[in-house]
């Protein structure tokens, strides 16, 4: 009986998570543009409230990016570890 695992799929999934993390920067910048365009709501684009919101938004996006990127790395590492273990075990049974 042969069991075939698709370890490449695991690696690709990890890479996709990391790529999506990278795409967050574009979303972050789009939101900042919208906030600045609605600066009157904050008391002006240069107001402390507006700038404070943008700063906090940046911190939040940074945390999300770091966590998503780290998760993607862990998924890729797990896939690689499984592939290596599978290869080692398979070799010992040959």
Swiss-Prot record:
- Primary location group: secreted
Plastid listed as a keyword: no
Q: List, alphabetically, the InterPro entries matched.
A: ESAT-6-like_Myco, ESAT-6-like_sf, T7SS_ESAT-6-like
This entry carries the following GO cellular component terms, namely: extracellular region
Reading the lineage from the top rank, the first entry is Bacteria
The reply to whether Cell cycle figures as a keyword in the UniProt entry is no
Show the Gene3D superfamilies listed in the entry: ESAT-6-like
Which subcellular locations apply to this protein? Secreted
| Keywords, alphabetical | Secreted
| The family this protein is said to belong to | Belongs to the WXG100 family. ESAT-6 subfamily.
Q: How does it assemble?
A: Strongly interacts with EsxK to form a heterodimeric complex under reducing conditions.
Put simply, this protein is called ESAT-6-like protein EsxL
Task: State the species of origin.
Answer: Mycobacterium tuberculosis (strain CDC 1551 / Oshkosh)
């Amino acid at each position: 009986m042969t069991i075939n695992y698709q370890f490449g799929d695991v690696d690709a999934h990890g890479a996709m998570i990391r790529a999506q993390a990278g795409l967050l920067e574009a979303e972050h910048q789009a939101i900042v543009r919208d906030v600045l365009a609605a600066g009157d709501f904050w008391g002006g684009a240069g107001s402390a409230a507006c700038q404070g919101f943008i700063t906090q938004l940046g911190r939040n996006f940074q945390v999300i990016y770091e966590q998503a990127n780290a998760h993607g790395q862990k998924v890729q590492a797990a896939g690689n570890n499984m592939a290596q273990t599978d290869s080692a075990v398979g070799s010992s049974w040959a």
